[in-house]
């Protein structure tokens, strides 16, 4: 029997990042930061853009997430303020040897506040383990636009997510009352689950747009017109929209990320009447 001790390998260092910000309306009708705290590799950048809205770009200097990494964003948009939040690039969730990667976003909007939450897509690798949660509390007269896209492997590079664990939960409250709850859960054989007609019908890129505002329901016909104008059918993107109780919801399904991104870009720009943040074009 060997007298040498069994080596004790150091545990992988987990990456933890958090951005907490506040935004408020200042003289002249523009929005400025009122508070900002950053920890770990997650940072906020404020590019100079024209217009009254403040644009914030979230930057992950770690380059990706895996194996128990934790990222969180908390944003409080004050009365009458207007902000856009996006990311510098697509977020990558790498294969995990067990621990779950956690991403959380907590959004609060005061009276007449506006926020467009427009991160670029999240790309999942085979064996990824992800738990993502988005919660929002908005005033009755606030306007919140949420967009998120998930890509299950980049088909152009021959990637397929055969196995993994995905939990994606959205909770939206207006005036203290829960008005929207949506949870996606895929465990184990992810590719097989996505192939089922009742889930994704073989789609490998999915996106959701939720718009909560007093006039949300009146914009349904316009959104459906944008779906047609975006050429979703020609791109092979399935799209459907519905509206109820001050909410407008759009779902997009595509065989891969490129047509989904193309359709989403056209729809988002038409819906908001503004170009997407410049980082979307790089």
Swiss-Prot record:
Q: Name one GO cellular component term.
A: cytoplasm
Q: What is the predominant subcellular site recorded for this chain?
A: cytoplasm
MF term (GO), any: nickel cation binding
Per the record, the domain of life is Bacteria
Show the HAMAP family listed in the entry: UreD
* Family note: Belongs to the UreD family.
Q: Quaternary state and partners of this protein? A: UreD, UreF and UreG form a complex that acts as a GTP-hydrolysis-dependent molecular chaperone, activating the urease apoprotein by helping to assemble the nickel containing metallocenter of UreC. The UreE protein probably delivers the nickel.
**Official protein name in the record:** Urease accessory protein UreD
Question: What is this organism's lineage?
Answer: Bacteria, Pseudomonadati, Pseudomonadota, Alphaproteobacteria, Hyphomicrobiales
- Name the gene that codes for it: ureD
């Amino acid at each position: 029997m060997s007298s040498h001790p069994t080596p004790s390998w150091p545990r992988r260092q987990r990456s933890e990042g958090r951005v907490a910000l506040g935004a408020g309306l200042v003289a002249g009708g523009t929005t400025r930061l009122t508070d900002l705290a950053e920890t770990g590799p997650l940072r906020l950048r404020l590019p100079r853009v024209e217009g009254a809205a403040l644009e914030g770009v979230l930057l992950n200097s770690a380059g990706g997430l895996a194996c128990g990494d934790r990222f969180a964003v908390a944003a409080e948009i004050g009365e009458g303020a207007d902000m856009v939040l996006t990311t510098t690039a697509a977020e990558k969730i790498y294969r995990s040897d067990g621990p779950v990667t956690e991403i959380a976003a907590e959004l609060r909007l005061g009276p007449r506040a506006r926020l467009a939450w427009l991160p670029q897509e999240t790309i999942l690798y085979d064996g990824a383990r992800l738990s993502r949660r988005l919660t929002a509390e908005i005033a009755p007269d606030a306007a919140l636009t949420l967009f998120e896209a998930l890509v299950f492997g980049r088909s152009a590079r021959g990637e397929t997510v055969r196995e993994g664990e995905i939990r994606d939960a959205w909770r939206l409250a207006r005036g203290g009352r829960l008005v929207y709850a949506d949870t996606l859960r895929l465990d184990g054989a992810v590719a097989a689950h996505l192939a089922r007609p009742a889930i994704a019908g073989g789609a490998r890129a999915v996106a959701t747009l939720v718009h909560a505002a007093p006039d949300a329901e009146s914009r349904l016909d316009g959104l459906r017109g944008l779906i047609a104008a975006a050429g979703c059918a020609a791109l092979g993107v399935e799209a459907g929209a519905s509206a109820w109780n001050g909410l407008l919801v759009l779902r997009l399904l595509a065989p891969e990320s490129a047509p989904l991104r193309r359709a989403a870009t056209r729809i988002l720009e038409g819906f908001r009447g503004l170009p997407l943040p410049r980082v979307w074009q790089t």
